[in-house]
Amino acid sequence: MDYAQPLAFFAHILEQKRLVTALEGNASVIDRQTGLTYVTPSGRMKLLLEKEDICVMNAAGEQIGGRGRRSSEYLLHEAVYQARPDVTAVVHSHCPFLTAYALRYQNFDVPETCSLREVFTHFT
């Protein structure tokens, strides 16, 4: 399956729900059957991403698709995928709410949640 479109859609949701700000944060999905990893590009507003912007990486770590430059956090995502074969998606959000939590060390409720499974089910 080509995960570029659902990942771009999910990136829109991340920004609409204010889980990322400005150019911060990134997300990826790995297709365990093909070995391809789809990752949001670096330095781009998530709300403006299109399918063609999503970077496609092969198992050797080479970018084989996408208009953008892969996220600088790509290697972090790959480390998660290697360490946890049960994980198929990673979101590194720089969420303002979690940043505030880290600064204040207080409990709080995150106002929005979003499931990658729900997003990707819509496209399958």
Show the residue positions of the predicted features:
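Glycine-rich flexible loops
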Residues: 1-124
